[in-house]
Design a protein with these regions (language model features):
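A short helix->beta-strand "capping" segment at the edge of beta-propeller domains
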Residues: 19-53, 105-117, 261-266
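Beta-strand-rich domains and repeat architectures in extracellular enzymes and scaffolds
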Residues: 44-89
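Short glycine/acidic-enriched loop and turn motifs that connect beta-strands
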Residues: 75-79, 142-146, 195-198, 250-253, ...
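Blade-loop segments of beta-propeller domains
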Residues: 86-142, 164-168
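Short loop/turn segments that connect beta-strands within beta-propeller blades
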Residues: 95-99, 154-159, 215-219, 299-303, ...
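Blade-level signature of beta-propeller repeat domains, shared across WD40, Kelch, NHL, RCC1
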Residues: 316-349
Length: 349
């Protein structure tokens, strides 16, 4: 297995590119992007909440219910005393309307969605999420007095949840950020940076920033990669042989040759606007990542194919059906409609 990292460079393109969103958000750098975008891609607003940044991470589409689950960015809980306001993160469920035919919608009326704040226990400060069995597996970042780890939640009311993992070698995780499930063996791979400590809601870390592999059947947990600055988003290639990890520090290194360990590590690409965050693959093996000016798309070889420009940037996103991409833009939820043949590798629909 190869671990490929996506690092970053900071420059003025984030602002310059974002201003072009309204004119044409779909930017092509390579002819292969035309096939992915289709002849008439669209970008539309699904929901906006001007009060809180409800659409920050996770992005888990449940096809059987046509629902989407997202986690917010941190915000100050107004229900606590002003002098001791606590940071809070909420899970939001968005019930989507039936999807219109991709790329053929003209003079659209505003899309109406139903929005519900999910109340559940055992997922303190939720962040990344992924489809898992009959529900969702979340990264629970934890707090000063609650455990961090991985938590499973049912995707239908009453949204029962439970911890699946809370420690490594009797040491608490720092603040798990994102996760992915290997499609062949069901193992769960996740990143654990120190954001929680840096952002003031977790104790001082007792583990370095690393990538872990958890085997639910045997309860085995092992470190599969280290040496990261801030490991963040994580995704597998469609064949499961390459693991992509977004990081804010460029690095090179070697792993251990083993079926459950990476054989090599390499820098895959550099995000040219802001810090790379969420990362996904399509069924062709192309790599998509959210960053400071929207979503960038690379070929499996690391060639920049195109971008979906979004003012304010994109922390995370997920594929829906037949060319849909749900884009998390903090206080806005957007939907891009690309070619129907452009499908996410995770669900393949």
């Amino acid at each position: 297995m190869i671990i490929a990292t996506l690092a970053y460079t900071l420059w003025a393109a984030a602002t310059a590119s974002a201003t072009r969103e309204e004119a044409n958000p779909f930017t092509i750098f390579h002819k292969d992007a035309k096939r992915l975008f289709g002849p008439s891609p669209t970008l539309e607003l699904l929901h906006e909440n001007k009060s809180i940044p409800f659409a920050h991470e996770a992005g888990v589409f449940i096809p059987q219910d046509n629902t989407l689950f997202v986690t917010s960015n941190r915000f100050q809980d107004p229900s606590t005393q002003e002098q001791q306001q606590q940071q809070r993160i909420v899970i939001t469920k968005i019930s989507l309307p039936p999807s219109s035919s991709p790329n053929k919608v003209k003079n659209r009326q505003p899309v109406r969605v139903q929005v519900e704040e999910v109340q559940t226990r055992n997922i303190p400060m939720p962040n990344g999420g992924v489809n898992y069995k009959h529900g969702i597996l979340f990264c629970a970042q934890g707090s000063m007095n609650t455990s961090s780890g991985l938590s499973f939640m049912e995707s239908r009311p009453p949204y029962r949840s439970r911890y699946m993992l809370q420690s490594y070698m009797n040491r608490p995780f720092s603040s798990p950020n994102d996760l992915v499930v290997h499609h062949r063996d069901g193992s769960i791979w996740f990143t654990d940076p120190i954001y929680g400590f840096e952002q003031g809601f977790r104790p001082r870390p007792r583990l370095p920033s690393q990538v872990y592999r958890f085997e639910p059947r045997t309860r085995s947990v092992r470190v599969v990669a280290d040496g990261f600055g801030r490991p963040n988003g994580i995704a597998f290639s469609p064949d499961g042989r390459v693991l992509y990890v977004t990081d804010t520090h460029r690095f090179h290194g070697d792993g251990v040759v083993d079926d459950t360990h990476p054989a090599t590590m390499r820098v895959f690409a550099m995000a040219d606007a802001g810090v790379p965050d969420g990362i996904k693959c399509d069924v062709y093996g192309n790599v998509y990542s959210g960053s400071g000016d929207g979503i960038s798309i690379w070929s499996p070889g690391g060639t920049l194919l195109g971008k979906i420009l979004v003012s304010g940037g994109v922390a995370n996103f997920c594929f829906g059906r037949r060319g849909e991409i749900f884009i998390l833009n903090e206080k806005r939820l957007l939907r891009a409609k690309l070619a129907p043949s452009t499908k996410g590798a995770l669900l393949g629909i």
